[in-house]
Amino acid sequence: MDEAIAYMELQDMQHKYLHQLSGGQTQRAYIAMVIAQNTEYILLDEPLNNLDMKHSVQIMKILRKLVTDLNKTIVIVIHDINFASFYSDYIVALKDGAIESEGRTEHIIQSNVLRGIYDMDIEIEEINDNRVCVYYA
């Protein structure tokens, strides 16, 4: 458990109750509980829900580190295509409850594929070797 607490950077608050933690701290505590179980697979449903940008990025970086450092397989349900683009190796895109498209991130984050998933035009820009989906225009 100490390793999981350290991994999630929760040492300063490890003796607090969950209801005393902020939203981001609570999410990290839940993920620490999963890490402590030391399973090969981690399944997370909307781990960024109700988090600000700072904490969302922090969680995604930690999850990516779990894959790299501890060889974990992580499956995440997430609605932000740019988080999926930056942090995923493989994407399964659902539309109306069925798989619309799946494949390595570089194959999914393409305008023609995303048009089929979202029924809208999405421009793709490259920033620091990462594909960013621009769909606000």
Residue ranges and their predicted role:
Residues Y17-L21, Q25:
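Conserved ABC ATPase signature
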Residues R115-A137:
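ABC ATPase nucleotide-binding domains
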Residues I42-E46:
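Catalytic Walker B motif of ABC-type/P-loop ATPase nucleotide-binding domains
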Residues V57-D69:
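Helical segment within the ABC ATPase nucleotide-binding domain
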Residues M1-M13:
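Conserved ABC ATPase "signature" region
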Residues E102-G103:
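ABC ATPase "signature
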